[in-house]
Amino acid sequence: KPKLGKLESVIMGIIGAKPLVDLMHAEAEANWIQQNEPEIWQQVHNFLLLSGYHNYKLTGNYKDAVASTVGFIPFDYKTQEWADQKDWKWRAMPIRSEMLPEVLPAGSVLGEITEAAAEQTGIPEGLPLIACGSDKACEVLGTGCIDNETGSLSYGSLATLNITSDKYLEAIPFYPAYPGVIPNTFNIEMMIQRGYWMVSWFKKEFGLQEEQLAKEKNLQPETLFDELLAKVPPGSDGLMLQPYWSPSNGDGPETRGAIIGFNEDHTRAHLYRAMIEGLTYALRESKELLEKRTKKSISRLVVSGGGSQSDEVMQITADIFGMTVLRPHNFETSSL
């Protein structure tokens, strides 16, 4: 357990931060390695996230982008620097400050491609490697979400709603706003775990017909699911789905999803539409919470991710949010 002092533990409990302390201690990868592979942890010289490891292999430098620094690590997301040595995070995991890379804002030079990396990758030797950001931070920027009045909806395996702010603000107390790709900005995020992963779940459990037909027509099965949505009226004839297959936004581990309102007339098409509607209503709730926290109205929504390829899904999104929604020509906005 984190080695917190008695007074510190009491304060954490009073302000409601103790569950987050326990979560970080339980989920930090460094703790797992130390506890399950102690002989490996004893040999650890540097502790890098995946982006930092790639940077090291390409340049030989222990450097990473500020906007890539997302995880269970001793990072101060408000100052966008490694946490002060007095911070409790250092006592929640075995990482020492000398193990961590230097972090630089997006646009900074992390180093140059080494001879060895050039031989292995074909990238020209000496080419500067520029700091950028995490996949989500790049996706938010790619949708043009550069202020707190534009919402970036991501319809991926993890469904999210992000806004960008120049002020640090936690949508859920003690859950940080992560660094944006634009220096000195923050991405304030709400998420639905197992979001559009549910489409994969539906395909596996109920989509054999679409899978077989898609194979014959050389299509993706998901493109045929639009026909199911079109068969069912808005509201799914009373069938409702609560999309919390996994806890989201600080919910407790007891959180579960629910499908409510079945009758003899409901079909798998009703289930699919209820699933899409339930996800969208959960994201609308996230929008309303963000607006309440920031005291700003989100006047523009841009949608990316695999789910945005569906015209029916986009129409459902517009109807439930009650506003025009936009999608880029390329749904993989992280690459933009």
Regions found by a protein language model. Give the residues of each.
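Conserved catalytic-core motifs characterized by acidic clusters
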Residues: 171, 175-176, 220, 256-261
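Glycine-rich, charged/polar anion/phosphate-binding loops
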Residues: 185, 224-228, 246
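Short, well-structured alpha-helical segments that form the helix of a local strand-helix-strand
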Residues: 217-232
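Glycine-rich phosphate-binding/catalytic subdomain of phosphoryl-transfer
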Residues: 1-216
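A generic structural signal for residues located within well-ordered alpha-helices
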Residues: 25-28, 194-197, 220, 237, ...
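Short glycine/threonine-rich catalytic loop with a Thr-x-Gly-x-Asp
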Residues: 133-134, 331-335
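Activation-segment/catalytic-loop signature of the eukaryotic protein kinase fold
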Residues: 231-333
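N-terminal entrance/gating region of PLP-dependent enzymes' catalytic architecture
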Residues: 64-68, 227, 247
